[in-house]
Amino acid sequence: MTERLIGIDFGTSTTVVHIKNYTDGRPSDGDGTSIQYVEFDGQGVVPSLIQKVEDTYYFGYDAKQPKKDEKIYRNFKMKLESSDEKEQAEAEKLTLLFFRFLYEAYEEQKVHFGTVQMEKTLISYPAKWTERTRRFMVSCAEQAGFPDVRGMDEPTAAMYSVSVQERERMEALGALEKGRSSYVLMIDMGAGTTDLALCRYKAGAQA
């Protein structure tokens, strides 16, 4: 069975869409540390930015280009839990538009990531968010077109990523020991939130 994991790190200031293919549960390229990215203007990261000019929306790097009579939306992720219902509703609309932009970019580039039998999507969100907002994020990604969407809090997702991509370096530093369980405090500092997660890690086991 071949499958693809699409990882979406929707940040307050920037967003990254990671791609990793697996065959029978193992990395298809034999390298657990290698990751592919959906690119935006040749970059593996895109500003979480929306620009509106009359009835037209621009996203990411396009939204950074000054235009006449523009309206800029930034940090809308942090307004998803606003106590102001109007502000929250606008943030939800903008988030859905942004996710559609991300999905269109993925669809345009997926041919370069190879053919798989199944696709799954993992989206992260701040640990402090309510269950309602977490469900909204999953639903938003689904509405945009992403397949089989699941959610995970950001510090835990960051720990999984670091334990895979930076394992050898962490072992060299003594933060992880081969064959032994380790407790790692993950501090995920973003533009809008800072989350902490205490994780138990052992090579070959789940965190």
Regions found by a protein language model. Give the residues of each.
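Short conserved micro-motifs on helix faces and helix-strand junctions that flank
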Residues: 6, 57-58, 151
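A short acidic (Asp/Glu
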Residues: 17-19, 132-137, 161-163, 196
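Generic beta-strand/beta-sheet core signal
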Residues: 123-126, 152, 187, 197-199
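Hydrophobic, small-residue-rich alpha-helical packing segments that form membrane-like cores
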Residues: 137-181, 189-190
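Short acidic/polar active-site loop segments enriched in Thr and Asp
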Residues: 13, 119, 147
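Short, well-ordered amphipathic alpha-helices
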Residues: 99-108, 163-167, 198-199
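Phosphate-binding loop and its immediate beta->loop->alpha context
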Residues: 23-144
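Gly/Thr-rich phosphate-binding beta-strand-loop-beta motif of the actin/hexokinase/Hsp70
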Residues: 2-28, 167-207
